Amino acid sequence: MKPGEYDIQPGEIILNEGRARLTITVENSGDRPIQVGSHYHFYETNPALVFDREKTRGYRLNIAAGTAVRFEPGQDREVELVEVSGNKIIYGFRGEIMGEL
């Protein structure tokens, strides 16, 4: 194997299989673009993003690791979220949870 080479098995890879999902509409009410990364706790995103925050507690974007979604100013966009896995303990981000969900 060479540095940077991938060894991907044949077949389909299903991300986040069997995990709870949620589809919501999000509006960027701000005057600047907002980008949200794949593992950011969606509940704690920029306050200029308008959506039912309480519904998103314990969820993140259902996109490939290392990628992000960009919300342009004034844009409404539908996104799919997936439940955070593991121990469901959240630290950091905007500091709104800092512990168990």
Curated annotation (Swiss-Prot):
<dbReference type="Pfam" id="PF00699">
    <property type="entry name" value="Urease_beta"/>
</dbReference>
<keyword id="KW-0378">Hydrolase</keyword>
<dbReference type="GO" id="GO:0035550">
    <property type="term" value="C:urease complex"/>
</dbReference>
<dbReference type="GO" id="GO:0043419">
    <property type="term" value="P:urea catabolic process"/>
</dbReference>
<keyword id="KW-0963">Cytoplasm</keyword>
<comment type="subunit">
    <text>Heterotrimer of UreA (gamma), UreB (beta) and UreC (alpha) subunits. Three heterotrimers associate to form the active enzyme.</text>
</comment>
<dbReference type="InterPro" id="IPR002019">
    <property type="entry name" value="Urease_beta-like"/>
</dbReference>
<dbReference type="GO" id="GO:0009039">
    <property type="term" value="F:urease activity"/>
</dbReference>
<comment type="pathway">
    <text>Nitrogen metabolism; urea degradation; CO(2) and NH(3) from urea (urease route): step 1/1.</text>
</comment>
<dbReference type="InterPro" id="IPR036461">
    <property type="entry name" value="Urease_betasu_sf"/>
</dbReference>
<protein>
    <recommendedName>
        <fullName>Urease subunit beta</fullName>
        <ecNumber>3.5.1.5</ecNumber>
    </recommendedName>
</protein>
<comment type="similarity">
    <text>Belongs to the urease beta subunit family.</text>
</comment>
<dbReference type="InterPro" id="IPR050069">
    <property type="entry name" value="Urease_subunit"/>
</dbReference>
